[in-house]
Regions:
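Internal, active-site/partner-interface "lid" segment
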Residues: 124-153
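Glycine-rich phosphate/diphosphate-binding loop of Rossmann-like nucleotide-binding domains
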Residues: 1, 5-24
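Short, glycine-/small-residue-rich phosphate/pyrophosphate-handling segment
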Residues: 89-135
Length: 160
């Protein structure tokens, strides 16, 4: 599996730890972030990883900034990206199973390296369940592609 990883200056150390962890798992890692502690604008890394995921240059993306929020917002501006910010493993796992997320973000100032590895592992090991979740992801894709949503009353059930 080929993983694109991006970060800002606040997350260099954690990016390096996660990159090594991914390599130990047998993943190929492509670095789209910075390797120095000099100020680096997180939208650049978020966008680059998002584009790489959307274009199919990498299979999945991982983003790390101070909180994970800003960098994920940048990635989510790229059509086809479903980035999630997670600070614990359960949400990471369910984001893949239910939302088919393709980019994971977390904060270097929020989680430590061991927790970050657990979040990454749960996210990578989870698989999209499809079923009722497929319809919901399709609705997200419709919003992404059209910047709108046409929900017909017969399709809007209590399950939705």
């Amino acid at each position: 599996m080929k993983i694109g990883i991006g970060n800002d200056h606040a997350a260099v150390e954690l990016k390096n730890i996660i990159s090594e962890h991914l390599k130990e798992r047998g993943c190929e890692v492509v670095n789209f972030g910075t390797d120095t502690s000099e100020s680096f604008d997180y939208p650049i890394a978020g966008y680059k990883v998002g584009k790489a995921v959307a274009n199919g240059d990498v299979d999945l993306g991982i983003l790390i900034c101070g909180t994970g929020v800003g960098i994920s917002l940048a990635a989510n501006k790229v059509e086809g990206v479903r980035a999630v910010v997670c600070s614990e493993p359960f949400s990471a796992k369910l984001s893949r199973m239910h939302n088919n997320t393709n980019v994971l973000a977390f904060g270097a100032r929020v989680v430590g390296s061991e927790l970050a590895k657990m979040i990454v592992d749960e996210w990578l090991d989870a698989e999209f369940e499809g079923g009722r979740h497929e319809r919901r992801v399709n609705l997200l894709n419709e919003i992404d592609h059209t910047r709108g949503l046409k929900v017909r009353s017969e399709e809007h059930t209590s399950e939705l």
